């Protein structure tokens, strides 16, 4: 279902290694910025290694070797692979576990405009996938990019009574966001000044009562 749904937006399926040299993560800075969720170990020669929780670093390394020509962009790849993340509180069956199967995708562009157009195309592809799967309770919300970084991020939330996250939904403007990314915009309402007039206010002791 995923491969069919993503066929129009991702043309290349790859399979990155689960075990990666720590040097890739040290170069990006995430080796130090990510906490204990990243599983680290050393091989028999003492070289530091990691178990992939995501593969941004590996994708960049691939493009370094492959994407030397301008004509090869935009460049999109995806994989469906086992990930490892040392969760502090594994729970809820398949909702949050240390080992899981995830579809992750990476794209590379020559302009911000091309990236934004492609992001919207991918977002619509996921909406079609959930619709085909018959999961109407899924909603797309604005989210915080977190350790992944980036300026724009959305996540698809499955509405369930056992969920732990809260989301904000505006029925008037269709704004949706999780609590980490939600923004509150207060508009100042102004009215024309009116002339002062005397008002009879018997048995009223506060401004609220007069209003």
Locate each region found by the language model.
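Extended, domain-scale alpha-helical bundle/helix-rich regions
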Residues: 114, 157-164
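Single conserved hydrophobic/aromatic residue that forms the stacking wall/gate
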Residues: 1-10
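Short Cys/His-rich metal-coordination motifs, predominantly Zn2+-binding knuckles/fingers
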Residues: 173
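Beta-rich nucleic-acid/ligand-interaction surfaces
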Residues: 16-36, 136-159
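Short cysteine-rich clusters marking metal-coordination/redox-active sites
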Residues: 170
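NTP-handling and nucleic-acid-processing catalytic cores
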Residues: 29-33, 43, 55-69, 178-211
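Residues forming anionic-ligand binding surfaces in small-molecule and nucleic-acid pockets
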Residues: 37, 42, 47, 75-113, ...
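Conserved alpha/beta enzyme-core scaffolds, especially Rossmann-like or related mixed alpha/beta domains
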Residues: 96-150
């Amino acid at each position: 279902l995923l491969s069919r749904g993503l066929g129009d937006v991702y043309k290349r399926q790859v399979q990155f290694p689960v075990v990666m040299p720590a040097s890739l993560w040290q170069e990006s800075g995430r080796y130090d910025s990510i906490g204990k969720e990243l599983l680290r170990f050393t091989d028999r020669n003492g070289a530091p290694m990691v178990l992939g929780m995501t593969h941004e670093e590996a994708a960049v390394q691939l493009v370094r070797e492959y994407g030397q020509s301008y004509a090869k962009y935009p460049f999109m790849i995806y994989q469906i692979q086992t990930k490892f993340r040392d969760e502090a509180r594994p729970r809820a069956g398949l909702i949050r576990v240390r080992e899981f199967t995830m579809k992750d995708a990476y794209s590379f562009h020559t302009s911000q405009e091309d990236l934004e157009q492609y992001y919207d195309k991918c977002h619509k592809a996921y909406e079609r996938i959930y619709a085909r799967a018959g999961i109407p309770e899924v909603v797309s919300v604005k989210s915080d990019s977190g350790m992944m970084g980036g300026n724009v991020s959305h996540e698809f939330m499955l509405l369930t009574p056992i969920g732990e996250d809260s989301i904000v939904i505006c029925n008037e403007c269709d704004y949706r966001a999780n609590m980490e990314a939600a923004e509150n915009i207060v508009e100042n309402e102004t009215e024309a000044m009116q002339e002062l007039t005397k008002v009879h206010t018997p048995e009223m002791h506060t401004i609220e009562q007069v209003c």
